[in-house]
Amino acid sequence: MATYAVGDLQGCLQPLKCLLERAHFNPAVDRLWLVGDLVNRGPESLETLRYLYSIRDSLVCVLGNHDLHLLAAWHNVERLKKSDTLREIIEAPDADQLFDWLRRQKLLHYDEPRGIAMVHAGIPPQWTLGKALELAAEVEEVLRDDGRLKLYLDGMYGNEPNKWSKDLAGVERLRVITNYFTRMRFCTATGKLDLKSKEGLESAPKGYKPWFDHPDRRSRHVKIIFGHWAALEGRVDVPGVIALDTGCVWGGAMTLYNVDSGEYHRCDCTREGTPRPAALNNDQP
């Protein structure tokens, strides 16, 4: 039995299938961890969700910002933007089945025997792993609650509040928790977010660092696998931090990581989100 983690799919199904074939992935015995952003911008968002649903018993999945955006558009189609490639999912005959599965996924996964956490964007430096799991569970509970789901999805958009406080309540509390787990790149040591800068490390605003680069980060004893930040190209010079979004949908690559052996497989991609000829290699990003 092998366990793999894969970077942001964003509706790019063929590179995923190429990687799984190369790794001899067997859904009957192996496990696949997904760092979120399963859909959007790529050519096969609906097919990707259907494929994942078909092997759902082999998956561990955390939600990304694009997945939450899809759930919001499911409840209010006016949320769709020109650049979104999500309408076919909303209009699909099996949409309700797919959405019900999607909303039951996690924001943060922790594999205690391995000492490894997986999250889409990151864990802010001021939270312990225990605190992060506790707050992730608050949002996960709302996602699975028919009575509160729509209110949360309507209110989750926005950059404020930009810092956690235990005194936050209601949708503002849920929004900042969501932003940490699904949108964060740069923050201060006390967790104040900058959600505008989206490029590489050199684009850090004054007084801000990548969330994983704060020396007193309270989750530093835990190995963390994350996606979201394609501009990093998978390069993070911090022990125990594994970045897997290597920009497949932008003409970069899709990266598969063996959680136990540390081996990487990479599939180089076209800007259309399809594999390049002779695209597979075993180089670390």
UniProtKB/Swiss-Prot annotation:
Database matches in InterPro entries: ApaH, Calcineurin-like_PHP_ApaH, Metallo-depent_PP-like
EC number: 3.6.1.41
Claim: Translocase is one of the keywords in the record: no
UniProt GO MF annotations: bis(5'-nucleosyl)-tetraphosphatase (symmetrical) activity
Protein name, entry field: Bis(5'-nucleosyl)-tetraphosphatase, symmetrical
Domain of life: Bacteria
Protein family membership: Belongs to the Ap4A hydrolase family.
Catalytic reactions of this protein: P(1),P(4)-bis(5'-adenosyl) tetraphosphate + H2O = 2 ADP + 2 H(+)
PANTHER family named in the record: CYTOCHROME C5, PTHR40942
Lineage of producing organism: Bacteria, Pseudomonadati, Pseudomonadota, Gammaproteobacteria, Pseudomonadales
Species of provenance: Pseudomonas entomophila (strain L48)
